[in-house]
């Protein structure tokens, strides 16, 4: 799954962009605790374990 697709899924769940440093983007949710960090350029594919970690941070449960 590409970084661009992960960002779209997070934004659809209510996460919004908080800050960026280099290629690391951090997203924040109004009602869920913590931040979700997504590393990489939008056109690049994420490693499956990295994707699983992002879903866990975002409390999304599984694959979209």
What is the predicted function of each stretch?
Residues 17-20:
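Short beta-strand
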Residues 27-31:
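Active-site beta-strand termini and strand-to-loop segments that position acidic
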């Amino acid at each position: 799954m590409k970084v661009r697709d992960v960002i779209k899924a997070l934004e659809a769940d209510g996460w919004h962009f908080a800050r960026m440093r280099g290629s690391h983007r951090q997203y924040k949710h109004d009602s869920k605790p913590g931040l979700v960090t997504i590393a990489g350029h939008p056109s690049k594919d994420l490693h499956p374990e990295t994707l699983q970690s992002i879903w866990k941070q975002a409390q999304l449960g599984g694959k979209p």
